[in-house]
């Protein structure tokens, strides 16, 4: 399971995933979308909560996860919603780390 793996160091010289690899890993996730923003492949998911306080608490859990994995997402916190977007800045695309962290986000809910 992806959520049981750890992220590995990803430098600018790392190789991003192929489209086929992205699709295979995406099939292991629930509710995540593969998007392209400014020509960069990213993973994105919106989580829904009953109120702002629950959404805020979840955002803090993601922040802790990001610190543990040394990999940082974009987090949009709104009333009752948290949108999480993962991609590897150093390679301007997707790495296995992004899928690992996406799975770990799901494990928090």
Swiss-Prot record:
One of its GO terms (biological process) is tetrahydrobiopterin biosynthetic process. It holds the Pfam family Pterin_4a. It is an enzyme of class 4 (lyase). SUPFAM superfamilies: PCD-like. Its EC number is 4.2.1.96. Keywords: Lyase. It catalyses: (4aS,6R)-4a-hydroxy-L-erythro-5,6,7,8-tetrahydrobiopterin = (6R)-L-erythro-6,7-dihydrobiopterin + H2O. HAMAP family: Pterin_4_alpha (MF_00434). Belongs to the pterin-4-alpha-carbinolamine dehydratase family. This is Putative pterin-4-alpha-carbinolamine dehydratase. It comes from Vibrio cholerae serotype O1 (strain ATCC 39315 / El Tor Inaba N16961). The lineage of its organism: Bacteria, Pseudomonadati, Pseudomonadota, Gammaproteobacteria, Vibrionales.
């Amino acid at each position: 399971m992806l959520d049981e793996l750890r992220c590995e160091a990803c430098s600018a010289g790392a190789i991003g995933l192929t489209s086929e690899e992205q699709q295979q890993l995406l099939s292991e996730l629930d509710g995540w979308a593969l998007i392209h923003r400014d020509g960069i492949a990213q993973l994105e998911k919106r989580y829904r909560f009953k109120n702002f306080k629950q959404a805020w608490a979840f955002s803090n859990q993601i922040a802790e996860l990001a610190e543990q994995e040394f990999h940082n997402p974009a987090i949009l916190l709104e009333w009752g919603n948290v949108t999480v977007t993962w991609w590897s800045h150093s390679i301007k695309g997707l790495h296995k780390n992004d899928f690992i962290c996406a799975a770990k986000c799901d494990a928090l809910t």
